[in-house]
Amino acid sequence: MAPAMDSAQNGHQSRGSANVLAIGTANPPNVILQEDYPDFYFKVTNSEHLTDLKEKFKRICVKSKTRKRHFYLTEQILKENPGIATYGAGSLDSRQKILETEIPKLGKEAAMVAIQEWGQPVSKITHVVFATTSGFMMPGADYSITRLLGLNPNVRRVMIYNQGCFAGGTALRVAKDLAENNKGARVLVVCAENTAMTFHGPNENHLDVLVGQAMFSDGAAALIIGANPNLPEERPVYEMVAAHQTIVPESDGAIVAHFYEMGMSYFLKENVIPLFGNNIEACMEAAFKEYGISDWNSLFYSVHPGGRAIVDGIAEKLGLDEENLKATRHVLSEYGNMGSACVIFILDELRKKSKEEKKLTTGDGKEWGCLIGLGPGLTVETVVLRSVPIA
């Protein structure tokens, strides 16, 4: 006779919602101020003769509201790999060679910070979820980080390649399902990005390149996710209440990217900003309706900083006070757009600032919050969060 349903589920499922138990971040040591970046960029790409294009790029950088960014690529590395700095040159091999090593390496740095905060042995990690849009290989970066960290060989791995900037939300959604449906699971989530795949020299016929070069940067973030925390050894940071994914209507082709011999080439339509802005409230309503929440200013936020204009558009459509996006704008200013890692950096900034400012909770003193991932598709990931009290 088969066991009763409740009995069967109790053997395999956790009873509570997934929790963020620890957060770690990492960046390459090479930092370039945004005000210096146009000179650097046009020098290393041998494009200083394109004076009009450089002036346009300077204006884009000023409008970005980014102060500095971290990069693996340096002038010396680009000299050693000239194809990466030349628009349209066959350079996929050079890019891949860098990324196959550097993505797991940077991911490991972030993971070690999270594991140290968690305070438990790595033998307790049961699952790995790794997300990146920076290169591809078999076995994947999930395998590499498992080996680098010395995790159990029977750890269950999920590799998320090439989903773009919304993949931080995707990784959290997948980790939530794993943690809640596997009793005792502890999931290591890693999101790592490196501009070695998207770096290109300027081209007068592909101005989208300039937008990306003014915004993209390198970084990795990691979390430990688990349900039913073992208190007091484990200390929850946020509760993950629900997770949703939505394709924005009539947005086909608004953001697309393709891999060619020149690396990843990306294309942006002018209607990206209004498409996100005009549809964000419907995504929020779908996520929060069952909790009776419709006052968007009552929430704390981690919004993917896909550019100043996108953040501004979402703030306007939701009627958000500027304070609600302080952490999002801080990450945009101090790190730029690190793709999938950004929303986790913002969660880290939120909980740290909340403690520094003596707020009552990890969510800037608020109880409920929302993580919003944005990217190609157009795709929106919404993760409903609850903060925890700060002791």
Curated annotation (Swiss-Prot):
Changing T133L: Changed substrate specificity. One of its GO terms (molecular function) is tetrahydroxybenzophenone synthase activity. One of its GO terms (biological process) is benzoyl-CoA metabolic process. Its EC number is 2.3.1.220. CDD domains: CHS_like. Optimum pH is 6.5-7.0. It catalyses: benzoyl-CoA + 3 malonyl-CoA + 2 H(+) = 2,4,6-trihydroxybenzophenone + 3 CO2 + 4 CoA. Expressed in young fruit pericarp. Keywords: Acyltransferase, Transferase. Optimum temperature is 30 degrees Celsius. InterPro entries: Chalcone/stilbene_synt_C, Chalcone/stilbene_synt_N, Polyketide_synthase_type-III, Thiolase-like. The active site is at C165. Pfam families: Chal_sti_synt_C (PF02797), Chal_sti_synt_N (PF00195). The keyword Flavoprotein does not apply. SUPFAM superfamilies: Thiolase-like. Homodimer. Type III polyketide synthase involved in the biosynthesis of benzophenones and xanthones. Produces mainly 2,4,6-trihydroxybenzophenone together with minor amounts of tetraketide lactone, triketide lactone and diketide lactone. The preferred substrate is benzoyl-CoA, but can also use acetyl-CoA, phenylacetyl-CoA, hexanoyl-CoA, cinnamoyl-CoA, p-coumaroyl-CoA and salicoyl-CoA. Belongs to the thiolase-like superfamily. Chalcone/stilbene synthases family. This is 2,4,6-trihydroxybenzophenone synthase. The gene is BPS.
